[in-house]
Curated annotation (Swiss-Prot):
The gene is DLT1. Required for growth under high-pressure and low-temperature conditions. It is a multi-pass membrane protein. Residues 1-15, 69-342 are cytoplasmic. Keywords: Membrane, Transmembrane, Transmembrane helix. It is found in: Membrane. Belongs to the DLT1 family. InterPro entries: DLT1. One of its GO terms (cellular component) is membrane. This is Defect at low temperature protein 1. Residues 37-47 are extracellular. It comes from Saccharomyces cerevisiae (strain YJM789). The chain crosses the membrane at residues 16-36, 48-68. The keyword DNA damage does not apply.
Amino acid sequence: MSGFAKLKSWLYKASLFVSLILLIGFSVVLPIDSIAQASKSENNAFNTFIVVGALVVFGVFCIFIIIGRMLFHKSCLKDIPRRYIPITPADLPHRSSREAVLQNMERSKELTILLKKPKDPVIHDGLEPPRRCDYPLDEKLFPEYLNYADCIKSLTDRLKYHGLFLNNLDVRMNLEDTFADVVNSQFVNHNANKIQLEKAKEFIDLYETIRFSGKDVTRDQFIKFVKFCLYFGEVSLTRDTSFANLHNFKLNGSSNNIGRTESKYSINPFDENEYAQDDMHYFPEPPTHLVRESSISTVARHVSSGVDLTNSEEHPLDTDSDCNALRLKLSKADSYRSVIRH
């Protein structure tokens, strides 16, 4: 603001102040003079009552007008849309104010275009950033908006409610044991591997820092935590007795033979049963799980003693009479139910 503009502003404020003082001073003279004249008259009480009553009525009327004007002004402001900006001379007579409004509008438009896309990647702790805000050269390892703290908490929830620690089914723990106690019992106690001991201690420190520091989990902390989980998950598989028993069961040939000869289930990919071999083409590789043998093969392998198929196998059936003779022999054989019970 220039010096001339400041001078005009000071003159305006000073003249307004003087005018208000004079107006109030001359307005106070009238009621004071009325009260003084009424007190000198013969009927003092009646005159005083009239003067004071007139002043009270005048004050109430002024207050009513002021309140009504305020309410009317407020109702008029409600009719104006919220997004309306006074830029016309009728709305804003002051020219400098209108120019300031227009300049700020142009500036806001420039800032909107400038800040629409951040210049640098915006990565906040606690959540996986979206691809558009992430570093373009970094590999996207996790889903967008992944909550790191919830993922880490799920590990302790599985340990607490399911007794499962890093896919290890052989977790021996008490109700009062913590995450650090389980890690110590699994990877620290009676362990001579220095690398595993060092990583186990780092794993415990990282977990306690994440869970109890009160700060959001950073991406680096979460990636490090996931690497520890993968590492100790592989280590725990070699120490899980249930997994070892299952592994031995798969590699034990005697178990396969027993399953083939004494049960209707087989895990041997080279089963001597030709009917079971017919189904092997459904598998891309020899299956390691139990495969149920076909009930048709069971029936075919238990031939009743009442049927003699020696001649039929040596002499193929060429005529209708041969087929009828074979059908007659089969009708004399045991039923399907008796064959299954055989």
